[in-house]
Each structure stands twice: as C-alpha cells, then as structure tokens.
C-alpha cells in the first residue's frame, strides 16, 4: 500500500511535459510518480492520436512500474490537464492509498472478451490484496484498455480467429465493458464465476469502474484508489454513481460531504454516456443519432459542463463511454477532497 498525494496541472498540448518541472518545484521527484492521468484534446475515438503522443512523451520520464492513463476528448468547457498520483514522501499517511499494475498483453482476438475481463479481475484483486484494504474502501478503479484497429482485425482473420466485433469504434465499448466486468468481480459486485455470462450480455455494471480505451497500448493499465482508516486523514475520496447525464443531485451530495468536513475539492473523476434508450428521463435526446459527432463526445460535453459548473473547475477527468461503469445512461463518479489536519 502506498499513501499518496494528488496534484494536477494544466497542459498546453498533448506533448506538454512542463508539469514535470512544476512537480519538482513543488518538492517532488519523478521517482515519486505512481500514475499520470490526463485529459487530452483529441476526439476520444479510435483515431485519437493525442493519447498516443501524451503516452509517448510521459512514459520515458516516469518509473517503469508507473502507469499512464490518458483519456481523449476535452469537448465543451473541459480543459486539458494531467493529474499526478504520487507516493507520499516518507510514506507519510495522507488518508488515501493507491496501487498500480498491468495485465499481460492481449492478443487481438482477446480484446473485449471474457478473457480480458478475467485478466482485469485477477490483476485488480491482486492490487487490492497488496494494498491491505477491503473492497468497501476502494472508491475507484481506473483503467486504460486496448481497442481493435484495422491492422489487428487483419491479424485476427489471418489466424482464423473471430473478433468480438469488426467495428473498430464498437471495439472501444466492448473493451471498456469487459474491463468494467473484471472490476465488478474484483470488488465483489459479482462473483468471479459469473464473468463469462456477464461479458456475453449487457446489464452488469460496477459503481467503481472508470475505463477508457485507446490504440496506444496492448495491455490494461490499472490504478486502484482507496481510502485508509488513518487517523488525522488529510485526503478523502467519496463516490457514488450518477443515475444519468443530468444527475446533479449525486454530484451535490458528494460536494456536501466535502463541505461538512471543511474540505477543498482536489479532483473529480466521472464517466459519461448517452443513454442507449434515446431518452434522458422523459426527454428524447439525439446524441445517438447524430451522424456528425459521436455520442461519447456529446456525453463528455454535457456531463463535463454539469460537473465543471458545480465544482467551479474545468480541469476535471470526464471520460466518455460508460458501458458497465455505473447504471445505463449514467456513470461512475468519484470526488477527492482535502481537509486541513
């Protein structure tokens, strides 16, 4: 278990590494980095190479056992930034702990399948065990997972295998869902034996899963965030799923918990999706039928604007595509805040 600090900084482009200097100015060394989690100004789709660029410039500059998780798409008021998860100097307790890890690399035909979910469940369970926390203490499992490209589909066909889908964009959703099912098993929301059934049909979801797909990796990068019972905690995490893209009440409820503690919000992590039913509550929406803009981009803009307005901060992590990450049409939500000791 690693007690952690969380710091975030704006970036001027996906290749901007100036936050590293700011991190050092704040008294931290790059060796303290557990994870770099960022929002980059791409389209968040299959051909979003802003994620690839960000990963390429950051990974050589952080410890080999650290992870990068970059989510493309800063639609609306969302502002590009990076959030550092840092080992607390001297392992001083802060109230939050984190662990990071990788699954093995996946063969193209395994992406979006129950094998991916099983590997995520195994790795995540191991991280939770290493941390010495209970699933109830876990507030978020953040994952970057692979997707299918045209080249990978050709490889699958050449091997006589069958891909989970032949649509590269849909593969993002299938990979996110498989990862979310794995998380659900790891935190005890479903039994491990139910993974194949859960992956084969929609409907399973985890309140603690936040998964983002990308072409920049072949494995899953995993970050587990948990609260500890340390006395005099300074950092706190609270979480609950949003019921839909208009669920201000859930955000306000978490903000109220921070307010009661006299806390200052450090970061918000949220998933967003266009309700597949075509309605938000009783109102019809057109996010799923827009031929110009993918629904995930609409959802990021809508939920990003809602949360940013409520917390008065545009440097928040809002990721589109919430398959299995909160109820259908909603999404997982985790708020981190800081109190004075």
From Swiss-Prot:
Pathway: Xenobiotic degradation; atrazine degradation; biuret from cyanurate: step 1/1. It catalyses: cyanurate + H2O = 1-carboxybiuret + H(+). Residues 95-229 are annotated as: RU B. Keywords: Hydrolase, Magnesium, Metal-binding. The keyword Metal-binding applies. GO terms for molecular function: cyanuric acid amidohydrolase activity; metal ion binding. GO terms for biological process: atrazine catabolic process. It is an enzyme of class 3 (hydrolase). InterPro entries: AtzD/Barbiturase, AtzD/Barbiturase_RUA, AtzD/Barbiturase_RUB, AtzD/Barbiturase_RUC. It comes from the Eukaryota. Substrate binds at residues 51, 71-72, 176, 212-213, 300, 319-320. The active site is at 144, 212 (nucleophile). Gene3D superfamilies: Cyanuric acid hydrolase/Barbituras, RU C (3.30.1330.160), Cyanuric acid hydrolase/Barbiturase, RU A (3.30.1330.170), Cyanuric acid hydrolase/Barbiturase, RU B (3.30.1330.180). Inhibited by barbituric acid. Residues 235-341 are annotated as: RU C. It holds the Pfam family Amido_AtzD_TrzD. Its EC number is 3.5.2.15. Mg(2+) binds at residues 273, 322, 325-327, 330. The record marks 296 as: Important for substrate specificity. Responsible for the hydrolysis of cyanuric acid, an intermediate formed during catabolism of s-triazine based compounds in herbicides such as atrazine and polymers such as melamine. Catalyzes the hydrolytic opening of the s-triazine ring of cyanuric acid (2,4,6-trihydroxy-s-triazine) to yield carbon dioxide and carboxybiuret, which spontaneously decarboxylates to biuret. Only active on cyanuric acid and N-methylisocyanuric acid. Homotetramer. Belongs to the cyclic amide hydrolase (CyAH) family. HAMAP family: Cyc_amidohydrol (MF_01989). The monomer structure is formed from three repeating units (RUs) that share the same structure as one another. The monomer, the active site and substrate all possess threefold rotational symmetry, to the extent that the active site possesses three potential Ser-Lys catalytic dyads. It is possible that any or all of the three active-site serines may act as nucleophile (albeit only one can do so per catalytic cycle). This is Cyanuric acid amidohydrolase. It comes from Sarocladium sp.
């Amino acid at each position: 278990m690693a007690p952690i600090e969380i710091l975030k900084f704006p970036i001027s482009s996906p290749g901007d590494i100036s936050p590293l200097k700011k991190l050092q100015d704040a008294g931290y060394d790059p060796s303290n980095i557990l994870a770099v989690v960022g929002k980059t100004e791409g389209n968040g789709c299959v051909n979003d190479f802003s994620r690839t660029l960000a990963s390429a410039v950051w990974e050589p500059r952080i410890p080999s056992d650290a992870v990068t998780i970059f989510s493309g798409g800063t639609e609306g008021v969302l502002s590009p930034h990076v959030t550092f998860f840092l080992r607390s100097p001297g392992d001083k307790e802060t109230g939050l702990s984190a662990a990071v890890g990788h699954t093995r690399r996946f063969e193209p035909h395994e992406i979006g399948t129950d094998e991916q979910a099983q590997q995520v469940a195994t790795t995540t369970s191991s991280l939770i065990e290493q941390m010495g926390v209970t699933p109830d203490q876990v507030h978020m499992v953040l994952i970057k997972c692979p997707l299918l490209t045209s080249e990978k589909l050709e490889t699958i066909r050449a091997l006589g295998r069958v891909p989970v889908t032949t649509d590269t964009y849909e593969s993002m959703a299938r990979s996110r869902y498989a990862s979310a099912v794995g998380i659900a098993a790891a935190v005890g929301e479903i039994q491990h034996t139910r993974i194949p059934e859960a992956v084969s049909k929609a409907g399973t979801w985890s309140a603690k899963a936040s998964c983002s797909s990308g072409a920049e990796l072949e494995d899953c990068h995993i970050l587990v965030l948990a609260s500890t019972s340390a006395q005099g905690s300074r950092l706190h995490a609270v979480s609950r799923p949003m019921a839909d893209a208009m669920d201000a009440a859930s955000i306000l409820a978490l903000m109220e918990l921070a307010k009661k503690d006299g806390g200052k919000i450090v970061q918000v992590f949220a998933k967003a999706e266009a309700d597949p039913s075509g309605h938000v509550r009783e109102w019809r929406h057109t996010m799923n039928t827009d031929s110009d803009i993918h629904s995930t981009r609409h959802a990021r803009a809508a939920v990003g604007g809602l949360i940013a307005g409520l917390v008065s901060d545009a440097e928040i992590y809002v990721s589109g595509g919430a398959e299995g990450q909160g109820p259908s049409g909603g999404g997982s939500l985790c708020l981190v805040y800081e109190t004075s000791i």
